[in-house]
Amino acid sequence: MDGEDVQALVIDNGSGMCKAGFAGDDAPRAVFPSIVGRPRHTGVMVGMGQKDSYVGDEAQSKRGILTLKYPIEHGIVTNWDDMEKIWHHTFYNELRVAPEEHPVLLTEAPLNPKANREKMTQIMFETFNTPAMYVAIQAVLSLYASGRTTGIVMDSGDGVSHTVPIYEGYALPHAILRLDLAGRDLTDYMMKILTERGYSFTTTAEREIVRDIKEKLAYVALDFEAEMQTAASSSALEKSYELPDGQVITIGNERFRCPEALFQPSFLGMESAGIHETTYNSIMKCDVDIRKDLYGNVVLSGGTTMFPGIADRMNKELTALAPSTMKIKIIAPPERKYSVWIGGSILASLSTFQQMWISKEEYDESGPSIVHRKCF
């Protein structure tokens, strides 16, 4: 199967958003929520063309009458039937392509269960009949997108965060750390602290409103304690947000208390280290000779790193942990929300990558376990 004549598809299946498009493009064509919604009520009007399930933006727009489910939790697919619906929607409705005509590059979180990528491989070849496919590690793709071959990627999405040190293009698996604390946990935490303010958000549809509040208004404080005092003594930090029904709510210290949980997971009742400490621990698991190169190339990627102020705070926290003479550089590319996808687009269009694809023939010969031999 010759990869030259046909464009590969790149699908970055995040826990929160699915990013899809064509290899060689500089941005994904389709970006939609990884949601499958099912009606909460039975339809009474005949001929309305009501469906038993909705995917992506359509589910989002009809969320008032639907129960929304995310098939990917913490980067791991928990519902394969819904996942198939999302892929089907990606190929046929969003990209409008026939999957049997294009090689497909999929992404996954590091340290995922092996069964997860085997099942992905199986569905691609058996349900969608793709001619070839590949599963790439998300953080590695982000590094590609930043134009580096060495660095430590702190990738934080909706479902999972991880730090992946990469040296001269090789990921160092023993030093990869995973943190099951990401955007969705911050949204839940925001729901909780808004409840303390007297605003109640409980349903799956209301959670989406809170996610929007978080994305539009939250930021990371450089000094949390000082910021708390500022918020207590003046209303300078207060912002208002208009709910879909016209009601206006005011939010103050919640704006920075919410993402602070990334640095202090104890806010969520978690015992784990914050993202700064996880990054540091990951660097310390690497050989002493390469640490300097990692400290100098800390690459942020994923939607949860989009909070204003996160890079400065990360710099401050890492500087406090690292040796005093160490030069620390945090790279936060403006397009980091999509850097995994962009890296996939770059990788799948490299001529040297074309022999890396798992072909249908290889799959038929070896079965799903081929994915562990061919993919990283």
Curated annotation (Swiss-Prot):
It catalyses: ATP + H2O = ADP + phosphate + H(+). Disulfide bonds: none annotated. It is found in: Cytoplasm, Cytoskeleton. Gene3D superfamilies: 3.30.420.40, Actin, Chain A, domain 4. One of its GO terms (biological process) is response to cAMP. Actins are highly conserved proteins that are involved in various types of cell motility and are ubiquitously expressed in all eukaryotic cells. Multiple isoforms are involved in various cellular functions such as cytoskeleton structure, cell mobility, chromosome movement and muscle contraction. This is Major actin. The lineage of its organism: Eukaryota, Amoebozoa, Evosea, Eumycetozoa, Dictyostelia. The gene is act1.
